[in-house]
């Protein structure tokens, strides 16, 4: 079989993920997000650096969700998501428990990151926090998910 394959192109750089698809199409596994951040994918980094957002982390093993927000106070979406890649929990109480009991490999295998709503840097942080609360209430993530507050 191998002798029938033809090499058409050799890439000048190693493949490091897809191009930025637009905020409404972001749905990334932990390893995809990690690759984007560690390789400093310019299209992605530029898009996330100055963006505020309400985002969703989904545990695909059990369907539990965590709703969070990225505001100026916490360094926008790139900084917020970089925190999750660094330790698996980003400082969140319930996510810390998962990393503590199941390990970082669990997060790497089962966590998925997406954007529910995105905003430019000028949007008032208080509005974003209100939208975060609305999503928590709508998705019942305090009762059935990983949100503590």
Q: What is the role of each PLM region?
A:
Residues 1, 85-88, 136-144:
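Short solvent-exposed strand/turn elements
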Residues 1-67, 71:
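GIY-YIG nuclease catalytic motif and its immediate N-terminal context
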Residues 43, 101-102, 138:
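A generic secondary-structure signal
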Residues 64-66, 77, 122-124:
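Intrinsically disordered, low-complexity acidic/polar segments
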Residues 73-121:
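Conserved short loop/helix modules at catalytic or binding sites
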Residues 109, 145-147:
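Long, charge-rich alpha-helical interaction segments
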Residues 122-141:
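Domain-level recognition of nuclease-like catalytic cores that cleave nucleotide substrates
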């Amino acid at each position: 079989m191998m002798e029938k394959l033809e090499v058409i192109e050799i890439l000048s750089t190693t493949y490091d993920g897809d191009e930025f698809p637009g905020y409404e199409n972001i749905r990334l596994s932990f390893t995809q997000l990690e690759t984007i951040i560690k390789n400093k994918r310019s299209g992605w980094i530029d898009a996330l650096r100055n963006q505020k957002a309400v985002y969703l982390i989904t545990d695909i093993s059990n369907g539990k969700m965590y709703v969070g927000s990225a505001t100026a106070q916490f360094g926008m979406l790139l900084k917020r998501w970089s925190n999750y890649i660094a330790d698996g929990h980003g400082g969140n109480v319930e996510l810390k428990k998962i990393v503590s009991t199941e390990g970082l490999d669990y997060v790497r295998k089962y966590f998925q990151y997406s954007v529910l709503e995105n905003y430019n840097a000028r949007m008032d942080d208080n509005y974003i926090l209100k939208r975060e609360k609305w999503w928590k209430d709508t998705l019942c993530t305090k009762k059935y998910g990983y949100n503590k507050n």
